[in-house]
Amino acid sequence: MSKLGILLTICLLLFPLTAVPLDGDQPADRPAERMQDDISSEHHPFFDPVKRCCRLSCGLGCHPCCG
């Protein structure tokens, strides 16, 4: 049993669990990239670049809104 423990210890030292990518493609793991991937107001289909606000209501996810 002690040989198994020694083998396990050596394996964990050589290949730590932090080196294994678990869910690297999840946006929650990369908040900076998630913020860049969000649709900004300027790229929203209802955004009016002349008025710098949305043409329709704010409930559609476009900010800043025309009051």
UniProtKB/Swiss-Prot annotation:
InterPro entries: Conotoxin. The modification 4-hydroxyproline is found at P64. Its main location: secreted. One of its GO terms (molecular function) is ion channel inhibitor activity. Residues 20-52 form a propeptide. Belongs to the conotoxin M superfamily. GO terms for cellular component: extracellular region. It comes from Conus marmoreus. The modification Cysteine amide is found at C66. Has been found to be hydroxylated and amidated by Han et al. (2006), and to be unmodified by Ju et al. (2022). Expressed by the venom duct. Keywords: Amidation, Cleavage on pair of basic residues, Disulfide bond, Hydroxylation, Neurotoxin, Secreted, Signal, Toxin. Negative results: does not show inhibition on Nav1.4 and Nav1.8 sodium channels. Intracranial injection into mice does not elicit symptoms. Disulfide bonds join C53-C65, C54-C62, C58-C66. This is Conotoxin mr3d. Residues 1-19 form the signal peptide. The cysteine framework is III (CC-C-C-CC). It is found in: Secreted.
